[in-house]
Amino acid sequence: MTAILITGYRSFEIGIFDHKDPRVSIIKQAIRKDLIGYLENGVDWFIFTGNLGFEQWALEVANELKEEYPLQIATIFLFETHGDRWNEKNKEVLSQFRAVDFVKYYFPNYEQPTQFSQYYQFLLEKTEGAYVFYDTENETNLKYFLKKAKDMPHYQLLLLTFDRLNDMSQS
């Protein structure tokens, strides 16, 4: 079994608030290309954390690819309370993350800051690599996860950057 964690910018972090934003289709084209590459190289599990934005779009693409490839999808939420305060539109997306092949909640609820590092350590230990939409020019809290991932020998990282997206949109 080979599992890849998929994570990246949340929609508000890159200013995309409408699913019909033309940038979403460019991002999804890149996702499709990269996920097919993973599948053709033996990956059989895509792991998500349940965030809006990049993960949401990658989940949509992964579900489409299930018609062509034998893949499994999991969502490992940080807390059972994930998404409880979301609006109805976003809760529809949350239901898609809960309708995958495997769902786990790492903690019942928030108690202390160390839960975040424990969660990311768990994700790193349970996956062989990560596909991350992230650019060092636009830092977020993902930088902590990426630092841990880069420190792990043999952990494979594939970054989708703004430069890669620009190249794809021009071709």
From Swiss-Prot:
Any single Pfam family the record assigns to this protein: YpsA
Membrane-spanning segments: none
PANTHER family: UPF0398 PROTEIN SPR0331 (PTHR38440:SF1), UPF0398 PROTEIN YPSA (PTHR38440)
Similarity-based family: Belongs to the UPF0398 family.
Listed name of the protein: UPF0398 protein SPy_1647/M5005_Spy1353
The organism of origin for this protein: Streptococcus pyogenes serotype M1
